[in-house]
């Protein structure tokens, strides 16, 4: 694949991914698997090389008699025999071979792709395109720089492979978990982020409370946000025998839940992700429209979105599957006589804010 084609494909992919705006995470990070903090975005250049390499093992198969194989052996057989020990027969005087240094461009690209593998082809477990692609892509780092930045601010170590793996998947939609992925990468566009990282001429003060708007300030601490989280965790605690107290690690990274009940944890993740989105939406209303959204309105929107998700799941899934997921413990809903009953009350209870000092402030992150 020519370089101009790779460039145009990458441009189309990342323009779509970032909605035509500035890329806030490196392309090499986005190409990592989900469990390593990426989005598993395809690398078109490496994918083209993997498709080429798929047929190279036939060149070293003495039993293959395809015409194109004899043609390939002529142009690059001698070079391949030096790279792969078990293909020494390609050096035989019985096989015509090209001894120059400038084979046709197509075969030159194949040789470059083989060099990028850094491994003898015969040592691979199989010759599928996926196997070649995994070997061609850059190895996953131990962890991304954002992981160290978060641990320094929180003064604790975190299980990042589990955190990255739990961000996407489960019962949440990709749209709902997008904000969690941005927070984990330290790229959510709070005012402090725009001021310190993007160097924009904007105030770093929150539009609602006037304090520096860090991630924790915007999503955990600002004005009535603790009341919203108090309501959300009162709902979440119905799934667990031991009450849970919210914290930044639990809200941002879903870390700290008991590991015994996977179905309860899956529903707790949904509630947290929807709550994060509605809190951020209320923040945007205050920032751009100069309107303060009351707590009651935010909670009402969370309930509305939960009802939408429950009804959609009921219409899409079989009844046993629905009961084992959304109907777990009959906290959010239940099915009686083939009728769906959504148990999330329309009534909103005002909670005291005296017990909402659970969100510890930590400074705005700056991640390279």
Predicted feature residues:
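Short, solvent-exposed helix-loop connector elements
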Residues: 1-4, 28-32, 254-265, 286-291
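Extended C-terminal regions of large enzymes
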Residues: 9, 21-189, 310, 314-368
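Short Cys/His-based metal-binding microdomains
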Residues: 42, 196-245
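Basic, alpha-helical interaction scaffolds
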Residues: 1, 54-60, 241-256
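Short flanking/linker segments adjacent to small metal-binding domains or redox-active Cys/His motifs
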Residues: 261-287
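Conserved, non-catalytic sequence blocks in retroelement Pol enzymes and Pol-derived host proteins
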Residues: 2-4, 167-173, 194-199, 263-267, ...
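Short secondary-structure subsegments characteristic of cysteine-rich extracellular domains
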Residues: 2-15, 293-310
């Amino acid at each position: 694949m020519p370089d101009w084609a790779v460039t145009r494909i990458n441009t189309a992919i990342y323009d779509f991914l970032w909605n035509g705006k500035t890329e806030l995470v490196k392309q090499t990070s986005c190409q990592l698997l989900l469990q390593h903090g990426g989005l598993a975005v395809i690398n078109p250049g490496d994918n083209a090389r993997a498709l080429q390499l798929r047929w190279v093992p036939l060149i070293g198969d003495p039993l293959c008699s395809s015409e194109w194989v004899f043609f390939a052996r002529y142009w690059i057989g001698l070079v391949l025999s030096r790279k792969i020990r078990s293909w020494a027969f390609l050096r035989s005087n019985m096989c015509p071979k090209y001894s120059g240094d400038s084979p046709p461009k197509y075969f030159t690209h194949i040789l470059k792709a083989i060099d990028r593998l850094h491994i003898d082809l015969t040592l691979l477990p199989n010759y599928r395109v996926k196997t070649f692609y995994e070997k061609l892509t850059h190895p996953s780092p131990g962890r991304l720089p954002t992981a160290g930045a978060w641990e320094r601010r929180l003064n604790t170590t975190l299980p990042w492979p589990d955190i990255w793996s739990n961000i996407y998947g489960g019962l949440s939609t990709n749209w709902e978990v997008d904000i969690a992925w941005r927070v984990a990468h330290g790229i959510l566009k709070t005012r402090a982020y725009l001021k310190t990282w993007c160097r924009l001429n904007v105030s770093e003060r929150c539009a609602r409370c006037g304090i520096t708007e860090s991630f924790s300030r915007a999503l955990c601490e600002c004005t009535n946000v603790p009341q919203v989280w108090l309501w959300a965790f009162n709902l979440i605690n119905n799934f667990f025998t031991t009450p849970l107290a919210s914290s930044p690690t639990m809200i941002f990274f879903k870390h700290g839940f008991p590991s015994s009940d996977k179905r309860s944890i899956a529903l707790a993740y949904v509630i947290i992700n929807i709550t994060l989105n509605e809190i951020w939406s209320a923040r945007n209303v205050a920032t751009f429209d100069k309107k303060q959204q009351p707590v009651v309105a935010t909670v009402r929107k969370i309930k509305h979105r939960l009802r939408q998700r429950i009804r959609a799941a009921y219409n899409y899934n079989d009844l046993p599957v629905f009961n084992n997921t959304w109907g777990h413990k009959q906290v959010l809903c239940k099915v009686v006589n083939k009728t769906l009953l959504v148990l999330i009350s329309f009534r909103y209870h005002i909670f005291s804010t005296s017990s909402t000092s659970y969100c510890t402030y930590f400074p705005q992150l700056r991640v390279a």
